[in-house]
Amino acid sequence: MSRLIVVCIVISMICGALSLSSTKMADEKKEKDEDEKPKISGGTVIAAGRLTLDLLKTLLGTLGSISRKIAIGVDNETGGLITGNNVYFRSGTSDDILPHRVETGEALLYTARKTKGPVATGAVGVFTYYLSDGNTLAVLFSVPFDYNFYSNWWNVKIYSGKRNADYDMYHELYYDANPFEGDDTWEYRYLGYGMRMEGYMNSPGEAILKITVMPD
């Protein structure tokens, strides 16, 4: 009888050790998988196939608890290289450097936010990229501070030749060049120069903007 009890105790100890070992191995595998997951951050370039609305929401979360912020993804399907030029901010700022080289089949990620502190600003600006044909792609984003008077807006335009983002470009894209309201709707537009675009922006103060530029 005593031998049976000893055998049972030994078996129980072995099973416990195996269970603990399996749990440890599972935890180590989970940690390894997490480490191997491609990290996302603003100011980077990813494969275009990875650019989804969910990825932009994840990117938005990296900015922390800021009430006015935006995560932007632009999928380059133009057939050529696009080269980052400059950013103009009407309000707010960014912690990112505009990605410099985005090959066709790649997507750029960029984030912007309101200025930190108790200041009544949103995240509003324009950035530009030079296309391989020598023209300029401009992207407007606008996440206002006060939703009693304003809404989210965005726009995309191709300018002839090389242009810098500045106040005049912002003013044209926001007021005159038929901007799109960020109202959770997909939009489509012919851009000229043999290109067209499709894009989506949502309506909250924590916004995402996804744009694809492609041949017409």
Swiss-Prot record:
Note in the entry: The partial protein sequence of PubMed:14680802 corresponds to the N-terminal amino acid sequence.
Record's protein name: DELTA-sagatoxin-Srs1a
Signal peptide stretch: 1-19
Stretch list, region Plays an important role in the hemolytic activity: 40-49
Subcellular location: Secreted; Nematocyst; Target cell membrane
Top-level division of the source organism's lineage: Eukaryota
Alphabetized GO MF terms: channel activity; toxin activity
UniProt lineage: Eukaryota, Metazoa, Cnidaria, Anthozoa, Hexacorallia
Quaternary structure (record): Octamer or nonamer in membranes. Monomer in the soluble state.
GO biological process: cytolysis in another organism; monoatomic cation transport; pore complex assembly
Primary role: Pore-forming protein that forms cations-selective hydrophilic pores of around 1 nm and causes cytolysis. Pore formation is a multi-step process that involves specific recognition of membrane sphingomyelin (but neither cholesterol nor phosphatidylcholine) using aromatic rich region and adjacent phosphocholine (POC) binding site, firm binding to the membrane (mainly driven by hydrophobic interactions) accompanied by the transfer of the N-terminal region to the lipid-water interface and finally pore formation after oligomerization of monomers.
Record note on domains: Composed of a long N-terminal alpha-helix and a core region rich in beta-sheet structures. Before the pore formation, the alpha-helix binds the lipid membrane, partitions into the lipid-water interface and stabilizes the monomeric molecule on the membrane. Finally, it traverses the bilayer, thus forming the transmembrane pore.
Gene Ontology CC annotations of this record: extracellular region; nematocyst; other organism cell membrane; pore complex
Subcellular location, principal: secreted
Family: Belongs to the actinoporin family. Sea anemone subfamily.
Keyword field contains Membrane: yes
N-terminal region: region residues: 48-67
Region listing for Trp-rich region, which is important for the binding to lipid membrane, in residue ranges: 142-157
Positions of the record's site feature: Important in the initial contact with the lipid membrane: Y150
Residues that coordinate or bind phosphocholine: S91, V124, S142, P144, Y170, Y174, Y175
Keyword Flavoprotein: no
PANTHER family registered for this protein in UniProt: BRYOPORIN
Proregion span(s): 20-38
